[in-house]
C-alpha cells in the first residue's frame, strides 16, 4: 500500500466525529480556531505515527522518501486536514535539531514533537528587527547552568498555544548584525515570560508579542555554538522550502476551487475578465507545483537554492492576487460582514500579509538580485555621529 493510500484510509476513518468540525480549518488566517480540538488532533496524529515520517528510523521516523512525503502532504490537504498545531515543531525545529543538535537534544526534544504533545513557536522578529532580522536586540547571558534572556519578540505565531519557543538572541556584548548571536530553546511556561496576543483586523489573534524578563533556558539548550545563531536560524528557514510547500499548494487549490464554485453559483463565471483571471490563477498554481518539485532535487540541509529565493515572492504575490480575485467574484456582498467573516473574506484579509511576513517582497527582490543573480549589493545609508 502506498503512503497516499495508507493516509487516505486513515483520514476516512479518523477525521470524523468531533474532528469533522475542524476539517478545512486552522490554516493560514484561521490558525487560532478551535485550539484545544486541533491540539487533540495533533496528538491523535502523533499516536498514529504520522509525525516525523522523514526522520531516520533510529529517531522514530520511517525514512520516507521526498516524493512519498510529497504524496503524504497532498493527500492530507485533499482531505481537508486541519491546520497542524505542531507544524512548526515538525517542519522547522525537528529538522534543525536533527542536522545541528546534539544526541542529548535529539533525545530530549524529538519525542515531544513526534507524539504531538509539545508545540513550538518561532522567536525571530522584534519591533526593530523584522525584514532587517540581523538587527536583533534581545539579550542572552550565561549565568551558571542557565541562559538568562531579556528582550521582546513580536508577530510570534501561536505562542499562546505553544510549550516551547526557539529564540535568536545576542550573547556577545558590542556585536552587531549577524555576529554574536545564539540560538536557544526556551520553555514558555515560566515566570519570566509574558505572552500578549495581537488582535487583527481579520478578527483573528494567532500572532503574539512575547516579553522576556530574566527568562531562563538551560545551558545545554543552545543549538550550535555562541556566534552561530545566525547560521542556525537561516538553516531553519531553509527547511521551510520543499515537500511541505506542496501541501500548502493543495490548500491554495482548495481556495481556488471555492472561488470557482462561488463564481458558478452567483453568475460571475460569465464575466470574461474574471474567467481570464481564474485561468491565470490556475496556471500560476501549476507553475508553483513544478517549481516546488524542482526544488526537491536541491540540498536538504537547510541551504537555499536560487529557486528557493524565487519561490516565496512568487507564491506570496500569487496568493495576494487570489484574495483580490475572491472579492471581485463575490461582488458587492464582499463588503458586507456578518457575525463571522466568510472563508473568502478571510482569504482576502490574510493574504495581504503574505507579501510582508517571512521577508517582504522588496527584501526578497534584493535577495534574488544579490544572492541568486550575483548583482552588486544595494547601497546602504550611513548614520553620522
Mark where each language-model region is.
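A short core secondary-structure module
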Residues: 145-146, 150-196
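N-terminal glycine-rich flavin-associated loop
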Residues: 84-104, 130
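Amphipathic, small/basic residue-rich leader segments at the start of a protein or domain
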Residues: 1-87, 107-115, 258, 265-266, ...
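C-terminal helix-coil-helix/basic helical segment that borders enzyme active sites and/or dimer interfaces
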Residues: 19-29, 268-275, 286-339
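Glycine-rich phosphate/cofactor-binding loops in nucleotide/flavin-utilizing enzymes
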Residues: 15, 65-67, 71-72, 92, ...
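A structural signal for short hydrophobic beta-strand segments in well-ordered beta-sheet cores
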Residues: 138-141
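Glycine-rich beta->alpha junctions and the first turn(s) of the following alpha-helix
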Residues: 2-5, 193-290, 354, 385
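A short, Trp-centered hydrophobic/proline-enriched beta-strand micro-motif
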Residues: 116-124, 168
Amino acid at each position: 500500500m502506498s503512503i497516499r493510500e495508507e493516509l487516505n484510509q486513515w483520514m476516512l476513518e479518523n477525521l470524523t466525529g468531533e474532528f469533522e468540525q475542524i476539517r478545512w480549518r486552522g490554516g493560514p488566517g484561521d490558525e487560532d480556531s478551535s485550539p484545544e480540538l486541533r491540539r487533540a488532533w495533533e496528538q491523535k496524529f502523533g499516536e498514529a505515527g504520522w509525525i516525523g515520517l522523514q526522520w531516520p528510523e533510529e529517531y522514530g521516523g520511517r525514512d520516507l522518501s521526498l516524493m512519498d512525503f510529497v504524496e503524504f502532504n497532498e493527500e492530507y490537504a485533499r482531505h481537508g486536514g486541519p491546520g497542524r498545531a505542531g507544524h512548526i515543531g515538525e517542519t522547522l525545529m525537528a529538522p534543525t535539531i536533527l542536522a545541528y543538535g546534539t544526541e542529548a537534544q535529539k533525545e530530549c526534544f524529538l519525542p515531544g514533537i513526534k507524539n504531538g504533545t509539545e508545540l513550538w513557536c518561532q522567536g525571530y522578529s522584534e519591533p526593530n528587527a523584522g525584514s532587517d532580522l540581523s538587527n536583533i536586540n534581545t539579550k542572552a547571558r550565561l549565568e551558571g547552568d542557565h541562559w538568562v534572556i531579556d528582550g521582546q519578540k513580536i508577530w510570534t505565531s501561536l505562542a499562546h498555544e505553544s510549550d516551547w519557543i526557539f529564540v535568536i538572541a545576542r550573547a556577545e556584548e558590542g556585536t552587531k548584525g549577524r555576529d554574536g548571536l545564539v540560538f536557544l530553546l526556551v520553555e514558555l511556561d515560566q515566570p519570566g515570560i509574558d505572552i500578549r496576543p495581537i488582535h487583527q483586523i481579520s478578527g483573528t489573534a494567532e500572532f503574539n508579542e512575547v516579553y522576556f524578563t530574566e527568562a531562563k533556558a538551560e545551558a545545554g539548550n543552545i543549538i550550535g555554538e555562541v556566534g552561530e545563531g545566525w547560521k542556525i536560524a537561516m538553516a531553519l528557514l531553509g527547511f521551510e522550502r520543499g515537500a511541505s510547500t506542496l501541501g500548502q499548494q493543495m490548500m491554495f487549490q482548495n481556495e481556488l476551487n471555492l472561488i470557482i464554485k462561488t463564481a458558478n453559483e452567483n453568475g460571475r463565471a460569465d464575466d470574461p475578465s474574471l474567467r481570464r483571471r481564474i485561468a491565470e490563477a490556475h496556471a500560476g498554481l501549476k507553475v508553483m507545483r513544478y517549481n516546488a518539485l524542482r526544488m526537491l532535487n536541491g540540498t536538504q540541509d537547510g541551504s537555499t537554492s536560487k529557486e528557493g529565493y524565487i519561490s516565496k515572492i512568487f507564491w506570496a504575490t500569487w496568493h495576494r492576487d487570489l484574495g483580490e480575485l475572491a472579492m471581485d467574484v463575490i461582488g458587492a456582498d464582499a463588503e458586507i460582514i456578518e457575525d463571522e467573516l466568510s472563508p473568502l473574506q478571510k482569504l482576502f484579509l490574510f493574504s495581504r500579509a503574505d507579501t510582508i511576513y517571512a521577508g517582504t517582497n522588496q527584501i526578497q527582490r534584493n535577495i534574488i538580485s544579490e544572492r541568486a543573480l550575483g548583482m552588486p549589493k544595494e547601497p546602504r545609508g550611513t548614520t553620522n555621529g
